[in-house]
């Protein structure tokens, strides 16, 4: 029975620790990260913390029950007193406390929203870079095949005494350098995956695959995109509102709460020559603090300066967001033009030259190395195009992030 239990437990543990294979698109990876990133999950608890502070804010202090006892040490005379006291605000302090906490709750929610925006941007950048690396690796592999054809041709010419062994060695060295470049691309991929895994919230044993292709540049986004939906701007606005309410709260703090209550006393006193008499009295008790020495001036100055600073922060964050959008759009426009030029002029010209050399080679007018080198130049142009296309999509990601685009969480 024990062995059976151990066996079942082992199977359960093995199933629980089984490596997971994730196959995601660029946007799918961003959505997955928003749902599973552990740091973001921890950040969301700040909303619950702020909600708890909101529940606690604006409440009256608990009433106080006071007791008095006095005893004459030379006789039986003594007194007992009981008082019930409650503090009451002289201003709208409790309402202002609630308003400050409500604004802080809105700021916490906006900060989490901004964290989602920045996380999605980081994941998109890593995913786009991985797609570009895969395409770059394919191009380098084609270049290696092209170089191997040239090496085989040069080796035959060296054996026939028609070419120098140094030229053949140089071609072989270039091919090995390309092989090293492919290995370096594998290193870059490992680094990117190492960056992407914690962002997605997956373990080191899990396999992450990014699917999709880098599409050709499309229409540019419209100018003057709105930034009011960005989390950092909303957080700045909410913090400014909290600071504004805090100024009013600091001014209200000049007037401390007054206390009012009921009191009852019972005394046993000697009334000569009649003896001892008992007296019971009921009354009111009132306490009013006077703002003679502390008028809360320091806190008022501090709160006023903080409110001005928060207003300036809104302007700074909005200006930064607008600058990011303009810069990303300009980068997209420039890179789209580069891709269009390579597609419309350079690659067609390279293909035309390659076809001409192929025809000349078939006619015996051009040696094969020239044809192979022409193919290599075309591969280099395709590699340049891929770099420009990758940078275009990275600029598009910057524009998405700058406008506050956040994907829906993916389960």
What are these regions (language model features)?
Residues 24, 115-229, 234, 328-331, ...:
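Periplasmic alpha-helical coiled-coil/stalk elements that build and connect Gram-negative outer-membrane
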Residues 98-102, 165-173, 368-376:
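Short, charged, amphipathic alpha-helical segments
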Residues 41, 60-79, 88-116, 133, ...:
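Small/polar (Gly/Ser/Thr/Ala-rich) solvent-exposed segments
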Residues 19-70, 87-88, 96, 102, ...:
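Bacterial Sec-pathway N-terminal export signals of envelope proteins
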Residues 82-84, 284-286:
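Membrane-embedded beta-strands of outer-membrane beta-barrel proteins
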